[in-house]
Structure formats: structure tokens, C-alpha cells
């Protein structure tokens, strides 16, 4: 037992962990003097920036402790007895689950939050010592094995994928043997359980939201439960909130979905610091100083999704370099939002408040007088309201605020 645990990297916390997780590519401000092609190529370094958040720390801690719990089950009498029971499964005989335990949890969050990157960063730190090897008896253990849930939720497909990924690390041939022997799904469960017990510490199944729409979703979750009981390993499933309604259908499914859940980032100090760090990586000829107004604009036009913020700043600079303006400002940011993020407009709607009503209501605009009382209807466009304001010599912003939610940002 101690031989296995001692080969695991020491758990990191505080500033040591933040320093290990953070990634800031090198940047020299003289790059802004280079030609356009050189700057456009260097601009992609923005995508390599990683600043750990509270989510990153929590995910690392959860994965490390789950791996530790799994490794603690790999020695002792119960582990030897479970190996014998798994052999019975392969031989299609009656068997018992010896290890068992509720060692599964979920990590769910909207796309673009950086949860997959946080998981990869955590795995990178946890597996710094590589494969764990023991001499008596000799065995090799993969600390973390990551697979993807098949789009059709095929139980056999996922079992074969686990074998294939294990072969890549162990240089074994479990996958080829399974194909040659044309083993059944039940036999595969016994085979994978035996391999997981002997060679896998933590199994991570990504894209688990596929179970919500696949007809084999419940069968796949049942297989993972059986794998936990027969191998004693910890299993982490990762996906979007689309999987939540599926796991809420029954208590036996809900028990398997306990874990970490994340939403869009809050408008707080971390978001401010994140935006300021990104603005340090400027590749346009002219430098732009970030303001509170720009940070607020970025939050509203990204919905608090980190990947969207990065895309906006990257594409804004790309547009500025290509069109020759050579300056990142609200004009280029707006152009990036309108032209490059079109598919996201249905999910990100800044400064718009939706109010449901069954009929069009007339709203009177106060603040100026005219020969005929002026009325503005909810279906009027912004352009028509501004045109009418110019004609009546009235305050356009004041008129718009009567109809829409308008926020004035000082830059």
C-alpha cells in the first residue's frame, strides 16, 4: 500500500498550486513593431494563457483525493478476492462484488468555462511522476485515464475505448485481443473491471451529456456503476448541464451525479484581473489601455464565458491588424462580436430585457412638447426613434430609455 501511495505526487495547495496551474506565454512588446504576418502568427499565443480560478483549485483537489481513495483499494485481501470474482465474470459464471463503494462524481458546467482545461491541468500536475510501478507483485498503474462517452452511448464502445486508451499507455494488446475473440459485453465488463483494478487509478469519462439523448443512456450509467463495484476505482464523469435532467430521473442515477457544478463567471475581481492580463498581450501597432467600461462591455458581450472573452480579444486584434486600423478598441470589439460570434448571439444578449405581453402597448414619451402628442410603440426600431428625436430636437438617449433598457458606459 505505502509503496503505491509514496509514488503519487504530493498534494499541492495555496500559492504552490496556483503557480503550477498558471500558464503565461512569453511576451515582448517589441512584437508590435514586426510585420503583420509575424504579429498574426504570434497572436495565437493568447489562446495559451491560463489563469487558475477557484474552479481550477476545486477540480484539482477533487481529482487528487478521488485518485488517492482508489489507490488505497488496490492492495489487501479484498483486492485479491475481487480479482477472482472478475475472472468469474469473464468465464460467465455467477460472481459477487467485493470492493463496491460510491466512488463516482460529476463535474458539470456550460461549454467554454474551461472545465476540460482545468481537468487537463490537474491531471498534468497529478501525473508528474508518470506511471506508478510496484515490484511485489509487479504491476503498472495509470494514475488518470481519460475517455469520451460515445455519441450513441454504446456500452461496448465505451468498454473497448477504455481498453484502447489503456493499451496506448501500457503498450499492451487488450484491445486487439478483445476484437479477435469477439467477446460479449458481459465478458468485456469482467475484462475491463480486472484491468481497471490492476492498472487504472482514476477513470474520467468526458461528454457524459450524451446519455441524456441516447437510448442506451441508462445502460451505460449502469455499466459504470458495475465497473465501480467490480474494480473499486473512482470514476469522474464530465459534461454540460444537459445531463442533469437525466440523472434526476431516479435516486440511483442522482446518487451517481453528486459532485461539482459550475455556471458563468461572476462579474468580480477575478474577471477584472483576467481581462487586464489578456490586455497585456497586444499585437497591434498602437497600444490600448483597458478601462472599466471595456471590462464591463466584455462581460456583457461574453455572458461571463471565459472562452468567449478570449475569442473577442483575439479576433478584435486580428481585425485591427488586417484592416490597418492597428488599434484594439470598442469599434473592433463590436465588429468581432457582430461578425465572428454570430452563432452565439442567441445565447448572449447584452442590454436587452425581454417582457412578455399579449398586445402592443402604447407608451407616451415625456420630456418635450409638440403640436401632436408623440407616441412610440414597442415595435419601433432604434433607427426610427433616433430619427424622430432629431426631427423633434429631443434627447435620443432619453427616448430610447423609455422603450428599451439602455446603459451608458463612460470610457
Give the label of every model feature segment.
Residues 192-197, 202, 212-213, 222-293:
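The catalytic "switch" region of P-loop NTPases
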Residues 1-103:
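Walker A/P-loop-proximal flanking segment of P-loop NTPase domains
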Residues 125-137, 168-169:
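Post-Walker A helix-loop "phosphate-sensing" segment adjacent to the P-loop in P-loop NTPases
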Amino acid at each position: 500500500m505505502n509503496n503505491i501511495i509514496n509514488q503519487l505526487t504530493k498534494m499541492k495547495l495555496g500559492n504552490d498550486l496556483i503557480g503550477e496551474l498558471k500558464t503565461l506565454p512569453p511576451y515582448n512588446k517589441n512584437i508590435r513593431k514586426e510585420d503583420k504576418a509575424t504579429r498574426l502568427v504570434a497572436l495565437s499565443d493568447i489562446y495559451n494563457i491560463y489563469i487558475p480560478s477557484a474552479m481550477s483549485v476545486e477540480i484539482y483537489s477533487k481529482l487528487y483525493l478521488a485518485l488517492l481513495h482508489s489507490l488505497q483499494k488496490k492492495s489487501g485481501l479484498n483486492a485479491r478476492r475481487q480479482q477472482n470474482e472478475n475472472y468469474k465474470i469473464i468465464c460467465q459464471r455467477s460472481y459477487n462484488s467485493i470492493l463496491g463503494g460510491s466512488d463516482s462524481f460529476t463535474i458539470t458546467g456550460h461549454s467554454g468555462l474551461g472545465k476540460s482545461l482545468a481537468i487537463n491541468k490537474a491531471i498534468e500536475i497529478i501525473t508528474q511522476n508518470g506511471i506508478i510501478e510496484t515490484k511485489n507483485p509487479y504491476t503498472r498503474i495509470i494514475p488518470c485515464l481519460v475517455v469520451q462517452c460515445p455519441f450513441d452511448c454504446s456500452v461496448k464502445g465505451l468498454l473497448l475505448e477504455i481498453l484502447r486508451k489503456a493499451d496506448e499507455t501500457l503498450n499492451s494488446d487488450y484491445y486487439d485481443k478483445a476484437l479477435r475473440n469477439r467477446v460479449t459485453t458481459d465478458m468485456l465488463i469482467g475484462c475491463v473491471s480486472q484491468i481497471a483494478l490492476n492498472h487504472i487509478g482514476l477513470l474520467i469519462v468526458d461528454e457524459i451529456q450524451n446519455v441524456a439523448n441516447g437510448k442506451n443512456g441508462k445502460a451505460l450509467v449502469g455499466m459504470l456503476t458495475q465497473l465501480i463495484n467490480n474494480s473499486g476505482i473512482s470514476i469522474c464523469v464530465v459534461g454540460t448541464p444537459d445531463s442533469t435532467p437525466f440523472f434526476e430521473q431516479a435516486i440511483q442515477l442522482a446518487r451517481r451525479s453528486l459532485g461539482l457544478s459550475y455556471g458563468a463567471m461572476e462579474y468580480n475581481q477575478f474577471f477584472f484581473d483576467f481581462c487586464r492580463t489578456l490586455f497585456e498581450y497586444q499585437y497591434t501597432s498602437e497600444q490600448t489601455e483597458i478601462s472599466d467600461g471595456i471590462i464591463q462591455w466584455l462581460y456583457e458581450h461574453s455572458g461571463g464565458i471565459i472562452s468567449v472573452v478570449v475569442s473577442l480579444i483575439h479576433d478584435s486584434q486580428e481585425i485591427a491588424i488586417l484592416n490597418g486600423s492597428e488599434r484594439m478598441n470598442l469599434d473592433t470589439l463590436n465588429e468581432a462580436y457582430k461578425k465572428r460570434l454570430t452563432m452565439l448571439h442567441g445565447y448572449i444578449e447584452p442590454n436587452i430585457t425581454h417582457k412578455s405581453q399579449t398586445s402592443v402597448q402604447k407608451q407616451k414619451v415625456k420630456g418635450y412638447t409638440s403640436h401632436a402628442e408623440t407616441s412610440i410603440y414597442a415595435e419601433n426600431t432604434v433607427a426610427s426613434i433616433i430619427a424622430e428625436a432629431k426631427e423633434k430636437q429631443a434627447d435620443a438617449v432619453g427616448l430610447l430609455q423609455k422603450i428599451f433598457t439602455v446603459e451608458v458606459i463612460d470610457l
